[in-house]
Amino acid sequence: MKWKEIAVLTEGICIEAIAGIFHRLGSGGVVIEDPQAARKYENQEEWNPNLVSPDFLDHEFVLIKAYFMEEREVMEELQSCLETVKENFNVECKVFIDEVRDEDWESSWKKYYHRFKIGERLVIKPSWEEYQPQSGEVVIDIDPGMAFGTGIHASTRFCMKFIDHYVKGGEKLIDAGCGSGILSIAAAKLGAARVLAMDVEELSVKIARENVELNGLSDIITVKLGNIVEEIQTFEADMVAANITAEVVTCLIPEAAKVLKSGGYFFGSGIVDSRWPGVEKQLKTHGFVIEQVLQDVDWIGVAARKE
């Protein structure tokens, strides 16, 4: 199968706006290359200079990449949306298009994606690696393919940590915008009784189902394609996880308030720090108490409890 890589070179102020556009257009994955954000990690222990080009940190502009099936026609709508971005943010946006084959993508993941631990119990690993878990560890096998959600990005780590901390066993959880299915699988592995995983992207649903099957959790996790707001109306939940964008998280909060039991939790992530005040206000407006806020450079994740 062949894919189109569409990349937008622009300024950091409009990262979330363009990532949101790609998401609405049905992208099978978004990659953000931000030298300014990377420079903040340069002196940290986990920084690996081998994962970036030698001159990457010297760049001033960001590159936002998205992936679409070759036959998908999105350029006309994308260009229209980018005109609005340029006008609203007073920036320039330069577009590049390239071809990517499945085997190119897969070989790249196998080169850079390795086992790592999140929280107290969760160990994430690709299926091609062998690992003997230590006492108390819960292992998740993930082949991310071109779907968002490997556990590497801060926004995914935040939600994983919330799930690790708050899931005690027997809960019903909704995973809104499930991507690779990693959050759903984590919840089920930690004892959730039932999980509804939703995404608007066909590719994400396909990959999530494959990962659910890979982990032997098809009897607990249901993966569906469609509108999460419409689907969850009849689903009473103990927890709702939304690792998407601040815009979508804000829209989901009122719906989460309707389906969550009293004392239930909402986990929101993918929130850039400039959008946090709006998300916080929306949570409080709809009867949530902020329990925990995590931040990594510009990214924020929140765990909130319904009163």
Swiss-Prot record:
Compartment list: Cytoplasm
One Pfam family here: PrmA
Cross-referenced InterPro entries: Ribosomal_L11_MeTrfase_PrmA, Ribosomal_PrmA_MeTrfase, SAM-dependent_MTases_sf
The organism's place on the tree of life at top rank: Bacteria
EC primary class: transferase
Keywords: Cytoplasm, Methyltransferase, S-adenosyl-L-methionine, Transferase
Any one biological process term the GO annotation gives: methylation
Substrates-to-products reaction catalysed: L-lysyl-[protein] + 3 S-adenosyl-L-methionine = N(6),N(6),N(6)-trimethyl-L-lysyl-[protein] + 3 S-adenosyl-L-homocysteine + 3 H(+)
A molecular-function term among this protein's GO annotations: protein-lysine N-methyltransferase activity
Chain positions recorded as S-adenosyl-L-methionine binding sites: T156, G177, D199, N243
E.C. code: 2.1.1.-
GO cellular component, one term: cytoplasm
Role this protein plays: Methylates ribosomal protein L11.
Entry similarity comment: Belongs to the methyltransferase superfamily. PrmA family.
Name of the protein this chain belongs to: Ribosomal protein L11 methyltransferase
Originating organism: Syntrophomonas wolfei subsp. wolfei (strain DSM 2245B / Goettingen)
Taxonomic lineage of the native organism: Bacteria, Bacillati, Bacillota, Clostridia, Eubacteriales
